[in-house]
């Protein structure tokens, strides 16, 4: 899937309208993967910038990942069984700064089937 990230407004877990096309492309790709292998596992990773407390950023990153998962299930029929979420807060900044930076406010996706598969 050739999408770097879905970016968010400051302090928000709502997926902006300008990012919705990415969600649709992600859903299409996930559904194709899952059609080929019903055991696919995809990890949705939430991130924040470094503004605010670590605890607030952790909660926000988890909410961002959960929002994408909900949208994929509700609007695009991606099976929830194949999706997992994690929030990293401000731990993995793309742009190392203590200031607000839109590139750090994101969710990323990772196919982890091969990592967790017992085969």
Positions of predicted regions on the chain:
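Periplasmic peptidoglycan-binding/anchoring modules of Gram-negative envelope and division proteins
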Residues: 8, 12-45, 69-74, 109, ...
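A short glycine/proline-enriched turn/edge-strand or helix-cap micro-motif
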Residues: 1-9
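Periplasmic OmpA-like peptidoglycan-binding domain that tethers envelope proteins to the cell wall
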Residues: 45-119
């Amino acid at each position: 899937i050739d999408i770097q990230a879905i970016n968010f407004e400051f302090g928000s877990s709502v997926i902006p309208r300008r990012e919705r096309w990415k969600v649709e492309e992600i859903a299409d790709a996930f559904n194709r993967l899952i059609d080929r292998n019903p055991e696919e596992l995809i990890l949705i990773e939430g991130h924040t910038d470094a503004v605010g407390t670590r605890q607030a950023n952790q909660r926000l990153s988890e909410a961002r990942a959960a929002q994408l998962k909900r949208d994929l299930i509700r609007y695009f029929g991606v099976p929830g069984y194949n999706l997992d979420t994690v929030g990293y807060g401000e731990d993995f900044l793309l742009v190392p700064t203590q200031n607000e930076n839109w590139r750090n406010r994101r969710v990323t996706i990772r196919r982890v089937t091969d990592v967790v598969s017992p085969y």
